[in-house]
Amino acid sequence: MNLGTLVSETRNPQTMDLDALPTPELVKRFNEQDTLVAEAVKATLPDVARAVDAAAAALKSGGRIIYMGAGTSGRLGVLDASECPPTFGVPHGLVVGLIAGGPGALLKAVEGAEDCQQAGEDDLVALNLQEQDLVVGLAASGRTPYVIGGLRYARQSGCTTVAVSCNPDSPIAREANIAISPVVGPEALTGSTRLKSGTAQKMVLNMISTGAMVKFGKVYQNLMVDMKATNVKLVDRACRMVVEATGIGREEAEALLKQTDFEVKPAILMALTGLDAAAAREKLAAHQGFLRAALEH
């Protein structure tokens, strides 16, 4: 492949004079380019929706969401995965981020790590990949061998696969069941795909993980009701969620949360139904953790 022909590697005619610009104009040019990202992502929403449903299906069948990428793409996957346990109360390891070169590559580039297809397969083998898992390959260029190797192995293993790339008709797209390709155009700094391409990938990952968790019963209305209240800020947020979802006063919300070890879902159910903590937990379990279903039935 001639990498110079990739959209993400071409020069941007709107930013040819970056080194000659005064600072206010410099940042204006970057901002102008960033405004293009949301529209590029918008064009992919039908494919993102398919990925959300696939991710939710994986979780409901006992599988995992596994992101894999190199460099910025890999770091974005690790970032999204690491935010899921505190935000949605899921165990570590339910959403996994793999980066070419291993954890050390998060802080320091591991040269050449992305160029090995076998490494992508090996990292999935080490995770004991199961067919219920969803594998999401991330590569701005769309041709990273590490990601191609991982996606190919995942499909051979019976997994549903998703490819996220910022170039059209990319090699990783051809390896996946679902291809998401927000084409953001040439970067302001030629080839620096940590810029618009990274932003687009982050937006897509936000929707995949958050959408899947909504479908997995981790959200009520627009509240993160399975959040772990592990610090002062989050305890306060838990109280506010109970107040906002039920209309009760803060003192009553705090009293209910103390009975549930600051678990928000049973506290809301208690406030709205009069159940005690044990009965609220039992009813939630009977509805697979979906608070709305527990309230309506």
UniProtKB/Swiss-Prot annotation:
Enzyme class: lyase
Entry keyword set: Carbohydrate metabolism, Lyase
Inducing factors: Induced by MurNAc 6-phosphate that releases the repressor MurR from the DNA. Repressed by MurR in the absence of MurNAc 6-phosphate.
Gene Ontology terms, MF aspect: carbohydrate derivative binding; carbon-oxygen lyase activity; ether hydrolase activity
Annotated metabolic or biological route of this protein: Amino-sugar metabolism; 1,6-anhydro-N-acetylmuramate degradation; Amino-sugar metabolism; N-acetylmuramate degradation; Cell wall biogenesis; peptidoglycan recycling
Known catalytic reactions: N-acetyl-D-muramate 6-phosphate + H2O = N-acetyl-D-glucosamine 6-phosphate + (R)-lactate
Gene Ontology BP term (one): peptidoglycan turnover
SUPFAM superfamilies: SIS domain
InterPro entries (UniProt xref): Etherase_MurQ, Glucokinase_regulatory_CS, MURQ/GCKR, SIS_dom, SIS_dom_sf
Note: A lyase-type mechanism (elimination/hydration) is suggested for the cleavage of the lactyl ether bond of MurNAc 6-phosphate, with the formation of an alpha,beta-unsaturated aldehyde intermediate with (E)-stereochemistry, followed by the syn addition of water to give product.
Oligomer status and interactors: Homodimer.
Cited PANTHER family: GLUCOKINASE REGULATORY PROTEIN, N-ACETYLMURAMIC ACID 6-PHOSPHATE ETHERASE
Name of the protein in question: N-acetylmuramic acid 6-phosphate etherase
The species this protein was found in: Salmonella paratyphi B (strain ATCC BAA-1250 / SPB7)
